[in-house]
Amino acid sequence: MYDKASISFVVLHYNTYQETINCVNSILHNVHPENVNVVIVDNCSPNGSGDIIRDTFIDEKRVYFIPLNQNTGFAVGNNAGINFARTELKSDFVCCINNDTLVEQNDFFSRIIDIYLETNAAVIGPKVYLKDNSYQLFNTKLETVSFYRKKLSDYKKSVFLLNLKYIFSKLGINISKNKNNLSNNKSKFDSKDSSFFETEHTNVVLHGCCLIFTPVFFEHFSGFSPDTFLYREEEILYIDISSVGLNNIYSPKIYIKHLEDAATNSLFDNNYKKLIFVTKNKIKSTRVLIQHMNSMNQTGS
């Protein structure tokens, strides 16, 4: 049934053109079948890098370029690529992958098909290595509403403190950095044994740097919930999938490399400004997540 299945990789681009070029080339060089396409969505990059991306791949028939007229964020930007992949390219599978990642596995797509046929998962997440070849750490658990309310309170306090530090830094007054900065807390999942990452897991919150949407997903949904700009998309996706009785899966049979946060870093010349931006978006998205959990009667675990 899936001997001639097709897949499109949706790569959301913003500013960092070399990372996007490297990501797309890694797909083209390592995922060989003719029924593989790449859809690059330029999220209205202000530095003109979208033109560089378009011109770089203008002669590559498997690469499509979609410029957006405003920065729509992660969910809506990816949805533009998903919609093109589904309606124009008729792709069976869609892989939304960060532009600061590399696909280094030449049987990546064939393994995706095998995993899907074995599990009927709506969304598949790969094992993720960082540039030093360590595992990408992330929390696979949907927490309780009370947990996220506490996080919301913490984020608000953090924004207040970061704004103060930013003002003082502009005045030339250095304040020692808080090692426990609330906007940059490590997940409690970080303490998990590394064997976790070499084991298949069903119905976990997946990492958003690479999410593979399968045919059964598109029987119920057209893409991400459009209500967030940045952050918490993975938890909301998990809730949506669970609400219709579908499963997702983390599989170590497929893997990518993640270079982390290149696009977000490109926005700022000041670390405080970056942290304020990140934390404000976490506040907005955590509010959306709490509303989503309440509307779906999801209590977390």
PLM regions with names:
Residues 25-35:
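Short, acidic, metal-binding catalytic loop of nucleotide-sugar glycosyltransferases
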Residues 162-184, 190-213:
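A recurrent flexible, glycine/aromatic-enriched loop bordering the glycosyltransferase active site
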